[in-house]
A protein has these predicted regions:
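Residues forming anionic-ligand binding surfaces in small-molecule and nucleic-acid pockets
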Residues: 113
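Aromatic-anchored, charged helix-turn/loop surface patch used as a conserved interaction hotspot
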Residues: 1-109, 155-173
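Long, amphipathic alpha-helical surface segments
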Residues: 127-173
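Short glycine-enriched loops at secondary-structure junctions
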Residues: 123-125
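Conserved catalytic/binding loops enriched for acidic/polar residues
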Residues: 118
Length: 173
């Protein structure tokens, strides 16, 4: 049985905790489970994207609870989630002290402006790229930025879902 077939057939009570470990939005998890079956990975990923992009602000904020600040080590997460976060933010681990300091300052500015952590799909991006993206996003109005956060959350969740439920030969696109 493929992982997607298993996902489609498994009890919601078994899958919900796994989904919430990927993105801590109960509404997202419940809607994703409620729309089964998907049949293949791409349909699952597309549904996830659509649901996340429609989340109300409070559910976006709930989802952010499982994400550490960019450039900070994950604390309070289970070891698997902390390791995943470290892999996703690997570019920041190679940041020079000046860039790391600027990122910490930018994180504080972002949180003061928007009331939530700066979320970006960090996998594969350098520290300099992450900092430049942060500075660009600080110029957004709150509504535009919330849409950007939803898009970044969708990208991160897509990668995590593909990692957890993809079958060999299938990747997130």
């Amino acid at each position: 049985m493929s992982q997607i077939a298993g996902f489609d057939a498994a009890p919601a009570s078994e899958l919900r905790p796994r989904l919430l470990a990927l993105t801590e939005s109960p509404l997202w998890a419940d809607q994703l489970l409620g729309e089964r079956p998907y049949g293949d990975l791409e349909h699952l990923l597309d549904a996830s994207d659509r649901i996340i992009r429609a989340l109300p602000a409070d559910q976006v904020d709930a989802a952010l609870a499982g994400h550490p600040r960019i450039g900070e080590r994950a604390s309070g997460l289970d070891p698997e989630a902390a390791a995943r976060s470290a892999r996703e933010q690997a570019g920041m681990s190679r940041a020079d002290p000046e860039t790391a300091s600027a990122m910490a300052e930018g994180n504080a500015d972002y949180e003061a402006r928007f009331g939530r952590i700066y979320l970006v799909a960090a996998a594969g991006r350098s520290a300099a790229d992450l900092l430049a993206f942060l500075r660009e996003r600080l110029r957004h109005d709150p509504e535009t930025e919330l849409d950007v956060v939803r898009g970044e959350l969708a990208r991160i969740t897509r990668l995590r879902l593909a990692g957890d439920f993809g079958t060999s030969g299938q990747e997130a696109s």
